[in-house]
């Protein structure tokens, strides 16, 4: 056997198992996982046109981030996978916990409270019906 054949076997196995669904990921979004999930739960399983309408009129801050991310996933589906927009729907959407920025808030009598500014990683995966 040739030298380095294990890496070649692993590379071939990874190519076979590669996920071909169009997706987009937003890392280090300055919104907490809980607040992002409120918006993601509203669009999960919907077709992309309906989801864009829901996001356009949703007053939450996370909806503007997710709307931009969804448009990116739609563009990936069109350009990279050659899928038509009419048949696309949101198969998976989830938010994972990211790092937390810790800040100090001065309080009375020399005390200090910790403020945690939470981040999340938001992922949207589309598929065709």
Residue ranges and their predicted role:
Residues 2-95, 119-129:
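Ribosome large-subunit tunnel/peptidyl-transferase-proximal elements
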